[in-house]
Amino acid sequence: MSKGQVLRNDQGIETTVRDSEGQRGDITGFGLCLQTEGMSGDETVFERIRGACRVAGRADNPQGLHQILSEWGLGHRAEDRICKLSGGLRRRVAVLSALVPVALNSEPSVVLLDEPSEGLDQSSRGLLLGWLRALAERGHGILVATHDPEVITACDRIVTISENSELTSKVQQSKLDIANLPEPCSAESHMELVAWACRLERRNPIDTIGRGVPALVALLLAYTLSTDITRSSENYDLLAALTLTPVFITAIVTPAIIKRLSEERAGDWWRAMSGAGSRGWFSIMGVSLILPIPMVYLSWYVIAGDISSTMNSDVMLWLWLFAFVIIDLSVAASALHLMVSDLTRSGAVAGILLQLVLIWPFLQMTSALTSIMSNGMSFELALGEPFADIAIAWLTVVLLWAMAVIIPED
C-alpha cells in the first residue's frame, strides 16, 4: 500500500485495508524472507543473492557478495544450484536474500522475516542475530515473525498474540553483539526479473521442449491428414487450419514459468519484490519469442505440397505476420494461465475452459491465410480481407491479455 491509512481495531471487526486509489503501489528495495525458501532450484547460490540485490535496486558488487557468502559458510557452494543444497544451506541463502539487499542500502529500509532461524545451525543463528542488530543500528526497520527465544532476544519490541487473539507488547533493550556489515553501495536499476527467467530457461529449457514437442506431434498429424487433401481452392481453408495448428499449439501450452513460480513460493517472493504489474511481466517472460517463426514456416513447407509457386511465394512473404500474432497470442495465453494459477481452485474445469477464447483469433488468422492463398495479400480494411482479419486477431489477443492482467486484483 502506498497511500491511505492503517488503523488498529481491537473490537473484533474485520476491516479491509487498501490503497485509497484502489491500486497496489510499488514498494521496492526491501528485504523479504518467507517461511518457505521462495527460490527456484535451478538458480545458483551466487545468482540468487546477486538477483535479490538487483531487484532491490543495488549496484553489482561480485567481490563483496562472495565475501559475504564465505562468512556464512557458502563460499564453496557459490556456483552450485540451490536444488543441490541441504535444507540448512538453502535456509541460509533465503535469509541472506533478505538481509544483504538492505545491508547494501544507504537509505533506511525494511526487512520482513518469517521464522528466519528455522533450519539454521548454531553458527548461522549467531550470524543472523548479529546482522539483525547491526541493521537496526543503521536505522533499518526489521519485522520478524518467530517462535525462537534466541531471535526474540535480538528484538527491541516484542508483540505477542495470544490464543484468543489478544495483543500484548513490551519493549526491551537487546545486548547482543553487532556484526560487521558490508559497506552500502550505490543504487542501480536492473531488469532482473527478465534476466532471471531467461537464465533459468537457458539452463533448463523445459519451456522450449514443452512447446516444441507437442507442436511437432501436431505437425506430423497435420501432414498425415493433408496427404489426402487436394490442393484446390475449395480446400484452402482446411489447409490453412492445418498449417496454423502446430504453431497455435506452441502458444497455448502451459508455460514453464508457472511451475517455476510455484516452486517453494518463488512467485510470491517475486510478486512482492517486483511490485505492481508483475503478472504482466510474467506473461511476457512465459512465452517463446523464437519458436513460432520457424514453426510456422516449417508447417507451411510440410503442408503446402504441390501448391503453385506463385501462391507459395505470396504465402511465404507474409507468414511472418502470422508468427507475430501467434507470439502475442502466446503472451495472452500465458496471462490466462497465470490468472487461473492464482485462483483458489486452479485446476477447476471452469478455469481451464478460459483457454477456449483463444480459438477466436486462431479462426481469424485461418480466414486471413485462406484469403492470401486464394487472392493474395490485400491491405483493405474490409471484413474478410487478409489484413483486416489479421488486425482483428491481434486486437482480440491484446484485449484478452488486458483482461487477464489488468482486471484481476493483485
Predicted regions and their residues:
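Conserved ABC ATPase "signature" region
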Residues: R50, P62-R77
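Long, hydrophobic alpha-helical segments
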Residues: A222, S226, D237-I258
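Conserved ABC ATPase signature
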Residues: R81-G88
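ABC-family nucleotide-binding domains
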Residues: D114, D121
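Hydrophobic anchor residue at the start of the ABC signature
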Residues: V95, L99
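Q-loop/switch helix immediately C-terminal to the Walker
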Residues: T36, G41-G57
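ABC ATPase NBD coupling module
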Residues: G12-G31
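H-loop/switch region of ABC-family ATPase nucleotide-binding domains
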Residues: A145-H147
